[in-house]
Regions:
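Active-site neighborhoods and metal-handling regions in enzymes and metal-associated proteins
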Residues: 1-596
Length: 596
């Protein structure tokens, strides 16, 4: 019997003992983070599925895992023998719709409220007939559960920061005043790290630390494991108006609040915290002020980001030169080797801290899984002709990077060249766009996809996401996807850092995705001044596209001009840094030649 099937049976026993008819297991921690500490990987524990997102529901008779289109193929394989069935999540098939349809008023739905988004609790109360019960049934089963992270917290040096934490706190308090609120609770780790100018190592790839922050009129309380903060840093925090409390004291402190207007962002707040509040507390639901403040990078941050992109670009030139030579020498290279070597070259930078996410290195048919991850148990060697997709990034003191490139192993065939060029056309289409400031970002996605739609091709993931500044590689509020709702918070603002990553995925054949990071930049000297401000996307990623995979007949003159200008900039910024690396310089020179 599968270990996961055994765990499901044990869970059902606990459900029966506690009169629970259905138990919902979310991919979440108390901060609703994208990447979770090992301690909070409940969904992985019960199902074995390690994708970045997914929701498990267990009843006495059935078990389901809902995942979106990125993970359908991967999840189908992993769930074999677990007794958990794959549910292909889309707009019509969600776990909330299943609960609404299948649970009755006399049944009880168990959920750990410490991991339940407040917004989801509200939705379930409205649409799910069953009674909700706060209960943790995973902890009793998980005997060898990892401990909570104990990594030290450190300062992000002021030379890299846009403002001091004292200044940032004042900016947030001004926003609070504008909203007529006297207290503000933040649980999202990137917001807290940005506001305090602190960083940590509690979550893989994201330099954040487990904490909550309660901002009052006269002080700010930082709830954190105090063993992670040395006495010198604590003194600095006190001088700037931040006072430490133990991480697990948050509920007790919230219970003390009374007769205050409390600002929260419901999509970034768990039900357990808000359910602990006194009835006299008036809750004001708005996006965290810090989210908009950190999303719009200022000129100082943008300058540092551009420096980080040079560091990353140099590492990539060295990496691709190594790969080219290894293939020419017929070395046996695996997808796992790609991951290791990319990290090795990035680590040569004095600014490097870590990778910014788990590298995706997929060869041929493996790249058809948009979020494929090679493992020691399942990986491919680069043995034959084909396409290798590499999606990788780094965390540097002066910025966060995220880039995807596709390179041929051997010689690309005509169909592969066609698909590569089509994705490049989509990439250039949105990269060349000029658009009104404050437009809802999801509306821009059609510009990207238009070249693909002309050939009745589409891809199942978003085109772009926000990126943090030495913070989370996936950051809001902007999102570039027509599948996302058009909301006030998704407006395009000057200074935002966003990814552009269209793709084509052909199951059993290959996957092609081409990704740059871009800065939302104001159009200077506009042709017309009567219609408000306009923005465009300025690429900051520095790495050439693969000209051997481009069918120049498919590109018009403006597309060629964009590509040549981009490659010219890449060469001019990277070549001076490669004087001591002749092989990397030769690799760069070959791929930045103008096309006609």
């Amino acid at each position: 019997m599968s270990i996961y099937k055994q765990r499901v049976l044990e869970l059902r026993r606990l459900m029966k003992e506690n009169n629970i008819d259905a138990y919902l297991i979310l991919s979440a921690d108390p901060h609703l983070s994208e990447y979770l500490p090992e301690y909070y990987k409940n969904r992985v524990f019960i199902s074995g599925f390690k994708g970045s997102v997914g929701t498990v529901l267990i009843t006495q008779e059935e078990g389901f895992l809902w995942v979106d289109g990125r993970y359908w193929l991967q999840a189908q394989k992993k769930l074999e023998g677990s007794g958990i069935l794959l549910q292909k999540q889309d707009a019509k098939n969600t776990f909330t719709k299943w609960l609404e349809k299948n649970l009755s008023e006399d049944q009880i739905l168990g959920i750990d409220f410490a991991l339940l988004p407040l917004s989801l609790q509200k939705d379930l109360k409205i649409n799910c007939k069953a009674n909700l019960k706060h209960i943790d049934l995973i902890s009793p089963l998980w005997k060898d559960r990892p401990t909570l992270p104990q990594e030290k917290i450190y300062e992000h040096e002021l030379e890299y920061c846009s403002y001091s934490r004292k200044e940032k706190l004042a900016l947030v308090r001004q926003k609070m005043k504008n909203l007529n609120v006297t207290s503000h609770l933040i649980s999202s780790l990137d917001d807290i790290a940005w506001l305090t100018n602190l960083r940590g190592n509690d979550v893989n790839y994201n330099p954040v630390f487990l904490s909550h922050l309660l901002i009052l009129e006269d002080k700010a309380l930082l709830f954190v494991d105090q063993k992670k903060v040395n006495s010198e840093l604590e003194k600095k925090l006190n001088l700037d108006g931040f006072w430490l409390k133990n991480y697990d004291e948050i509920i007790m402190e919230l219970e003390k609040l009374a007769n205050t207007n409390l600002l929260i962002e419901p999509s970034k707040m768990t039900a357990l915290l808000i359910n602990s509040l006194d009835k006299s507390v008036k809750i004001i639901q708005e996006i965290n002020p810090s989210t908009h403040l950190k999303a719009a990078k200022n000129t100082k941050e943008i300058a540092h980001i551009q420096d980080a992109m040079i560091e990353d670009g140099v590492a990539l030139c060295k990496f691709f030169a190594w790969l080219e030579e290894a293939i020419e020498n017929k070395e046996l290279i695996s997808e796992l080797d790609i991951d290791v070597k990319a990290s090795e070259f990035r680590a040569q930078s004095k600014y490097y801290i870590s990778d910014s996410f788990a590298t995706i290195a997929g060869f041929n048919e493996n790249a058809a899984y948009p979020h494929y991850k090679a493992t020691k148990e399942s990986f491919a060697y680069l043995k034959k002709d084909g396409l290798l997709l590499i999606d990788s990034g780094g965390q540097y003191k002066n910025g966060t990077t995220d880039i995807t490139r596709v390179v041929p192993i051997g010689k690309a065939n005509a169909e592969q060249i066609h698909d590569y060029t089509l994705v490049l056309k989509a990439h250039i289409a949105i990269s060349s766009a000029i658009f009104p400031k404050d437009i809802a970002m999801p509306l821009l996605d059609a510009i990207t996809r238009a070249p693909l739609w002309k050939e009745q091709i589409d891809y199942i993931h978003g085109t772009g996401h926000g990126v943090g500044y030495f913070l989370n590689v996936h950051e809001g509020p902007q999102v570039l996807s027509y599948l996302s709702p058009v909301l006030e918070k998704t407006k395009a603002k000057e200074g935002m850092l966003t990814s552009i990553e269209p793709g084509i995925y052909k199951v059993g054949k290959w996957g092609i995705r081409l990704e740059n990071l871009v800065i939302h930049t104001k159009v200077e000297n506009p042709k017309n001044k009567d219609f408000g401000e306009f923005l465009y996307f300025k690429p900051v990623t520095l790495c050439p596209f693969e000209i051997s995979c481009i069918d120049t007949k498919m590109l018009d003159e403006k597309e060629k001009e964009w590509l040549n200008n981009y490659h010219k900039e890449v060469f001019e910024k990277l070549s001076p840094k490669l004087g001591d690396y002749p092989k990397a310089l030769v690799w760069l020179e070959k791929r930045t030649k103008a096309i006609f």
